[in-house]
Design a protein with these regions (language model features):
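Zn-dependent metallo-beta-lactamase
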Residues: 1-19, 26-29, 96, 103, ...
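Glycine/small-residue-rich loop that forms an oxyanion/phosphate-binding "nest" at active or ligand-binding sites
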Residues: 55-111
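Active-site environment of divalent metal-dependent phosphoester hydrolases
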Residues: 28-29, 50-55, 75-78, 93-96, ...
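Active-site neighborhood of phospho(di)ester-bond hydrolases with catalytic His/Asp-centered motifs
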Residues: 21-23, 41-49, 69-72, 134-139, ...
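Short active-site oxyanion
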Residues: 1-2, 62-67, 131-133
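Pre-active-site segment of Zn-dependent metallo-hydrolases
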Residues: 12-50, 55-59, 73, 110-115, ...
Length: 226
């Protein structure tokens, strides 16, 4: 299993046969590692529809003819924009594929698309390649994060926002790390723009001194193997 960080909150998960793309904000992203036109995903998963997460979803999905998974109101808008394969779960809902599954989890944030569609933001619990990956989405710290790993879903890798201002900051993210108890944490949603600049190395030091989790800091374009 490989996890490639593409900048901001965008990741590509690959088990060798399948490539799953999360929150493909590439065009207009000063930290983007690739052009949207370079990607051929098997599926696109969205945490929510703010411009820095929805990004290039529609263009990529149309070109690659791949499904998009998003919460129901956001999925309806994407389908209305010409994407043929759209899956529309709500919080707590699971969608299964031949490569694995994705479940929408709560996230504390706001969400409205650039065209004005309000919807509920989500986190993503993903099963792929025999691993469980938790992308927290944009969120504040909240205690129900403890429940995400219930029913034996131990988190192998957490993709965690740490930038503050629009989401929890690195100090709250340390508390989130204690709740989630992931094997590895990859920080994201920081340093893309001035309001979310932070010290990722300090986050790594705090997490590794206060929890059993390891932190892998990736630069855009770098890959973590698990």
């Amino acid at each position: 299993m490989e996890i490639r960080f593409l900048g901001h909150a965008c990741f590509e998960l690959s088990d060798g046969d399948t490539r799953v793309l999360i929150d493909p904000f590439l065009t207009g992203n000063p930290k983007a590692a690739v052009e949207a036109s370079e990607l051929e995903p098997s599926a696109i998963l969205l945490t929510h529809g703010h411009a820095d997460h929805l990004g290039d979803t529609v263009d990529i999905a149309k070109r690659a003819n791949c499904p998009v998974v998003a919460i129901v109101e956001l999925a309806n808008e994407i389908g209305g924009n010409g994407v043929e394969q759209v899956f529309d779960p709500n919080i707590g809902g699971t969608v299964k594929f031949d490569w694995g599954w994705v479940k929408l989890t709560p996230a504390w944030h706001t969400a409205v698309t650039p065209s004005g569609t309000p919807h509920t933001p989500a986190g993503l619990l993903i099963g792929i390649g025999g691993k469980t990956i938790y992308h927290l989405g944009d969120t504040a710290l909240f205690s129900d994060m403890k429940l995400v790993a219930h029913r034996g879903n131990a988190i192998d890798v957490a993709l965690m926002c740490i930038g503050g201002h629009y989401t929890m900051d690195r100090l709250d993210a340390v508390e989130a790390a204690k709740f989630i108890e992931a094997g590895t944490i990859i920080p994201c949603h920081y340093d893309t723009f001035p309001p979310i600049e932070t010290d990722a190395e300090a986050f790594k030091s705090d997490v590794e001194s206060e929890t059993s989790s390891k932190v892998q800091i990736l630069q855009p374009g770098e890959t973590h193997s698990t």
